[in-house]
Amino acid sequence: MLTIFAVSDSIGETAQQVAMAAASQFKDNAEVKRIPYVKSLEDVEDLIKTIEDCEACMIVSTIITVNVREYLTQKCIEKNINIINVLGPIINVASTILNKYPDYNPGAMWNTDETYYKRIEAMEFAMQYDDSKDYRGLKNADVVLVGLSRTSKTPLCMYLANKGIKAINIPLVPEVGVPEELYEIDKKKIFGLTINPLQLIEIRKRRLDKFHRISADIEYASDSRILEEFEFADKILRKIGCRTIDVTQRAIEDTALIIMEKLGVK
């Protein structure tokens, strides 16, 4: 198992995303651990002590502060630890093109401006109205996701929220139906999530295996149950008249990009 340490002198989200993108190419053979706020030489020393005995590891660093970044690189060379400095080369090239000295301001991307507060508000909105907890959020949502269970509605809502988009999701369950409010809002902001039946069966079976569920939950992944749900979902989505997105073998980021493009959001 390879451990990728995402190291930053700020919150570490950028380093973590880069590390996770790399780790995802190796499925269960790589994990990511985020280590934020490495702001001093002492912090670097503590970091090295923590990871130097790791048999298979590497560092993905987005440290901005020059002396801290260089010291970390030096210590990694001494300890034979692989390190990738993600931002250093990019900043150097940008500096050359612009003929301007960089600010070297850790966390500048996450300054508490209007965009930051919009993201926080959207994330709180997504958690409050997740999985039909409260339908009152429908009219205030920027995006409404409608789909069967295990079509990535919740993680997609959270991803969109991180972009400052208020998203709410409505599960399609034959025994429950959908709220009438769904037919009263602008259908341009509603997106139906569809998926290949075989993939959905596989996803649900894996979930049952993970939690060792039996009895009533067996129906959850049965062919007949999923066929019933697909027929119900098709009926509802046709009635709404909304746009649909096939999420089969599609990454959450790709689905989010499609939605953002449809909404005209960059």
From Swiss-Prot:
Q: Which residues bind ADP?
A: 147-154
MF terms in GO:
ADP binding; ATP binding; phosphotransferase activity, phosphate group as acceptor; protein serine/threonine kinase activity
Q: Does the keyword Nucleotide-binding apply?
A: yes
InterPro entries, sorted: Kinase-pyrophosphorylase, PPDK_reg
Reaction it catalyzes: N(tele)-phospho-L-histidyl/L-threonyl-[pyruvate, phosphate dikinase] + ADP = N(tele)-phospho-L-histidyl/O-phospho-L-threonyl-[pyruvate, phosphate dikinase] + AMP + H(+); N(tele)-phospho-L-histidyl/O-phospho-L-threonyl-[pyruvate, phosphate dikinase] + phosphate + H(+) = N(tele)-phospho-L-histidyl/L-threonyl-[pyruvate, phosphate dikinase] + diphosphate
Which UniProt keywords are given for this protein, alphabetically ordered? Kinase, Nucleotide-binding, Serine/threonine-protein kinase, Transferase
Whether RNA-binding counts among this entry's keywords is no
HAMAP family this protein is in?
A: PDRP
Its family? Belongs to the pyruvate, phosphate/water dikinase regulatory protein family. PDRP subfamily.
What does this chain do?
Answer: Bifunctional serine/threonine kinase and phosphorylase involved in the regulation of the pyruvate, phosphate dikinase (PPDK) by catalyzing its phosphorylation/dephosphorylation.
Its recorded name reads Putative pyruvate, phosphate dikinase regulatory protein
